[in-house]
């Protein structure tokens, strides 16, 4: 057992040593728009996210690139649905984490890299009664929180394409375009509702 453990540790160390030279930490800032087609809610809201992620080389130009983005948004309940809200008509404030789990393929062109990616996004949200809203609406906050995870509303297949420039040695900067497909809405026949489009400014080292 001890021998197997040592072999496993040695293998992990060897694998990490292979990847460490190209392992990158990525910081991001991203304006995002969430499509809302229901007039009972806010017009498609624009929010801003801040994120951190990693790029781990796999083989050839393939990479594994998990990324976590934090943002917040207001929500309300209308027509028995959870909808984005304007600040004047809000019920809940929900801090949110979008966890991207994509694989990508880096295409090098001298000091320029194009990286298409595809994967899954997991949208983690929890709402709190917004400041200034009556406690009588607490039940609506419970409804909102249940709605976040009902009928796969948390699962977002995603596609992305990044454009990065090598500034010096391992320091890179660029931007990416992302699209998140709301699986919960698709299953209800509302493909566009809750779709997310994001422009991501990236810094990697």
Q: Which ranges hold each PLM region?
A:
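Cleavable N-terminal export/targeting peptides
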Residues: 1-24
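Predominantly the C-terminal beta-signal and adjacent terminal strand-loop region
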Residues: 65-79, 147-150, 154-205
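Residues on the lipid-exposed face of transmembrane beta-strands in outer-membrane beta-barrel proteins
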Residues: 29-33, 50-56, 68-72, 97-105, ...
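Flexible, solvent-exposed loop segments that connect beta-strands
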Residues: 35-42, 71-96, 126-153, 186-190, ...
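Outer-membrane beta-barrel channels and translocator barrels
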Residues: 23, 57-61, 107-112, 166-170
């Amino acid at each position: 057992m001890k021998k197997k453990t040592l072999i496993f540790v040695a293998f992990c160390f060897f694998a990490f040593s292979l990847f460490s030279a190209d392992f990158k930490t990525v910081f991001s800032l991203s304006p995002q728009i969430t499509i809302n087609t229901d007039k009972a809610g806010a017009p498609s809201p624009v929010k801003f996210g801040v994120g951190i992620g990693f790029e781990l080389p796999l083989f050839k130009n393939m990479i594994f690139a998990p990324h976590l983005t934090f943002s917040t948004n207001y929500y309300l309940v209308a027509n028995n649905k959870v909808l984005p809200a304007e600040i004047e008509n809000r019920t809940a404030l929900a801090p949110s984490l979008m966890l991207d789990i994509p694989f990508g393929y880096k295409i090098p062109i001298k000091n320029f890299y194009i990286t298409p990616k595809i994967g899954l996004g997991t949208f983690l949200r929890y709402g709190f009664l917004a400041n200034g809203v009556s406690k009588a609406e607490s039940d609506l906050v419970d409804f909102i929180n249940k709605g976040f995870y009902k009928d796969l509303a948390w699962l977002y297949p995603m596609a992305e394409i990044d454009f990065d420039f090598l500034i010096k040695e391992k320091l890179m900067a660029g931007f990416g375009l992302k699209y998140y497909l709301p699986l919960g809405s698709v299953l209800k026949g509302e493909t566009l509702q809750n779709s997310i489009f994001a422009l991501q400014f990236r810094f990697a080292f």
